[in-house]
Regions:
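Loop/turn segments within WD40 beta-propeller blades
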Residues: 16-22, 56-63, 99-106, 111, ...
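Canonical WD40 repeat/beta-propeller blade segments in eukaryotic WD-repeat proteins
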Residues: 10-17, 51-58, 89, 93-101, ...
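Short C-terminal beta-strands that terminate individual repeats in beta-propeller domains
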Residues: 3-8, 43-49, 86-91, 128-133, ...
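Blade-level signature of beta-propeller repeat domains, shared across WD40, Kelch, NHL, RCC1
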Residues: 339-368
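Conserved strand-to-loop turn within each blade of WD40 beta-propeller repeats
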Residues: 27-30, 68-72, 104, 110-114, ...
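A short helix->beta-strand "capping" segment at the edge of beta-propeller domains
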Residues: 1-10, 40, 187-190, 316-329
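WD40-repeat beta-propellers
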Residues: 33-37, 74-78, 117-121, 160-165, ...
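Conserved blade-ending motifs and adjacent loop-strand segments that build the rim/top face
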Residues: 237-251, 288-344
């Protein structure tokens, strides 16, 4: 049974984050921002204009500094004095969907609806790079742990890209539509699992494990795909059906076990997976990939793809039939999941779920 935090929002909650001290911050529709005590009481609130707050993220080096996105703006706040933004940037071309601050707090990445990613040098307070390669909405961007100049992005163009801040082009790209075409042989299995076969694999979210080399993607086809980064490329490790509708959220938990993965979906379900069982059990290289052959219909000139693309083998995914991971925890939340986070609340690791109701739901994680 979930514990509900109420009284902070009258509109749908869109995003959550918690700092190392367990302070929780939530952002909602119509510009409403709220901080919460461990008792579930609103501590302070701020209205950041009329635009929805789409992302909140604490600095990894200063637990009092909070980065938020609302509309085309980025506000930097001091949560000790939540009266107004300490600084505000308006550098993006369209509504911002996602922010990511690297571990050293030297750079901030902001992905928007135009498909662009703005890289802000936080020391000089200016844009140092603009990354333009997504042809549709860039839904998520995230810096890799232990690698402050490397980041991943994904979008509704069904592309996942690996970037290095020293370059303006992605160093590696995977097209999920091509990946899905190779997975069509799994159709019978997917029907049995209740997946929506006709949903395109629009990529909603990525999360990187603490090692910095393993990451997960959640997509509109309900699947969760696990990749491993080796050097300047990444390859498919495993893919499985996580939700009967789109997988909107994936988050690696910051626990002693590095591969606990939390997922949330448009089916109203929240699940916890141990994806390390597969990664550690195999103890082998990722499934081999080969560069995709250039054809008239898919040449870089036609598609604007100037980076390497790979044609991922579906072999790993076919093994789902016998190796589909079982959820360690499955929660019927009952509403489409807008956001997932985790925090230590009253000494217990806890899942926090945001949805359209304006409440924050808490589910305890036990025996992990």
């Amino acid at each position: 049974m979930a514990t509900k935090w109420t009284g902070g929002h009258s509109t749908g909650v869109l995003c959550l984050d918690a700092n190392c001290e367990g302070l929780v911050v939530s952002g909602a529709e119509e510009g409403n921002l709220v901080t919460w005590s461990s008792e579930g009481c609103p501590v302070s609130s701020l209205k950041l204009g009329a635009d929805d707050i789409t992302y909140v993220s604490f600095s990894r080096t200063d637990s009092n500094t909070l980065y938020t996105s609302h509309g085309e703006a980025i506000s930097i706040l001091d949560i000790r004095c939540l009266k107004e933004a300490a600084e505000c940037f308006k550098v993006n071309e369209d509504e911002i969907n996602c922010l990511s601050v690297n571990e050293t707090s030297s750079h901030l990445a902001a992905a928007d609806d135009s498909g662009s990613i703005k890289i802000i040098d936080l020391a000089n307070r200016k844009v140092s790079r603009t990354l333009r390669k997504h042809s549709n909405i860039c839904s998520c961007v995230t810096f890799r742990p232990q690698r402050p100049h490397s980041l991943l992005s994904c979008g509704l163009d069904m592309q996942v890209m690996l970037w290095n801040l020293q370059k303006t082009r992605p160093v590696w790209t995977v097209n999920f539509q091509e990946l899905t075409e190779e997975e069509e042989e799994e159709e019978e299995m997917q029907q049995q699992a209740g997946c929506q076969l006709f949903n395109p694999p629009l990529v909603h979210f990525t999360s990187v494990a603490s090692c910095g080399n393993v990451f997960a993607c959640g997509a509109e086809d309900g699947k969760i795909r696990i990749f491993r980064i080796t050097g300047t490329r990444f390859e498919l490790e495993h893919g499985f059906s996580g939700h009967s509708l789109g997988t909107s959220q994936v988050h690696f938990l910051n626990l002693s076990h590095p591969y606990w993965l939390l997922s949330g979906g448009n089916d109203g379900k929240v699940a916890l997976w141990d994806v390390g069982e597969r990664i550690l059990k195999d103890n082998r290289s990722p499934s081999k990939t080969t560069p995709r052959k250039k054809t008239k219909a898919s040449s870089p000139a036609k598609k604007g793809l100037a980076t390497k693309e790979c044609n991922l083998s579906a072999q790993t995914c076919k093994e789902n039939k016998s190796n589909h991971p079982l959820a360690k925890l499955s929660i019927d939340h009952g509403a489409k999941v807008n956001w997932l986070s985790s925090a230590e609340i009253k000494g217990r690791k806890t899942i926090l779920v945001a949805d359209h109701t304006g409440c924050i739901s808490l589910y305890p994680l036990t025996n992990l």
